[in-house]
Amino acid sequence: MTVPRTGRPGGIRAAAPSRSGWRTQAPVVAVVALGGGTGAAARYAASLWWPTPAGGFPWTTFGVNAVGCAVIGVFMVVITEVRPAHRLVRPFFGTGVLGGFTTFSTYAVDSRSLFADGRLPTGLAYLAATPLAALTAVWLAAWAARRVLKWRQS
């Protein structure tokens, strides 16, 4: 049997998704969309509650990203080490809610704006501090969650 060649790398055409594949993926897509809308609404609420002044340091975006990363640190410990979750919990909350809440695209835009406004030291500090804060938040939150769980079990 020969496979039709295409202009794609390797020249092999991808198989069309089966009907059963769509049926199993539709709930995942739906919960990611629902969670994403929820997370984005929460981020928008944070920007209204804690607005960034024109030309100021983007503390809201910085805080949202750090908090979102801390929450995902706790969430991953709970669903991987404590109690397995329903198959839609991780895509809803981890990918959807937290993906919609955190905003690394706005981080990039904020960084570019700081540089464009001639605020090089602030832009560089923000550019370096955000991923450092995000990674530290994930690590510390996961560590703290494990400590609390160990303490509760003893």
Curated annotation (Swiss-Prot):
Native source species: Streptomyces coelicolor (strain ATCC BAA-471 / A3(2) / M145)
Classification via PANTHER family: FLUORIDE EXPORT PROTEIN 1-RELATED
Tell me the residue numbers annotated for binding Na(+): 99, 102
Name of the protein described by the UniProt record? Fluoride-specific ion channel FluC 1
The UniProt entry lists membrane topology as:
Multi-pass membrane protein
According to its record, what are the GO cellular component terms?
Answer: plasma membrane
Q: Where in the cell is it found?
A: Cell membrane
Task: Give the gene that encodes this protein.
Answer: fluC1
Free-text function comment from the UniProt entry: Fluoride-specific ion channel. Important for reducing fluoride concentration in the cell, thus reducing its toxicity.
Family recorded in the similarity comment: Belongs to the fluoride channel Fluc/FEX (TC 1.A.43) family.
| Keywords from the UniProt entry | Cell membrane, Ion channel, Ion transport, Membrane, Metal-binding, Sodium, Transmembrane, Transmembrane helix, Transport
Keyword check for Isomerase: no
Q: Which InterPro entries match?
A: FluC (IPR003691)
Q: Which GO terms describe its biological process?
A: cellular detoxification of fluoride; fluoride transmembrane transport
What sections of the sequence does the record tag as coiled-coil? none
Query: Which reaction is catalysed here?
Result: fluoride(in) = fluoride(out)
User: Main localization of the protein?
Assistant: membrane
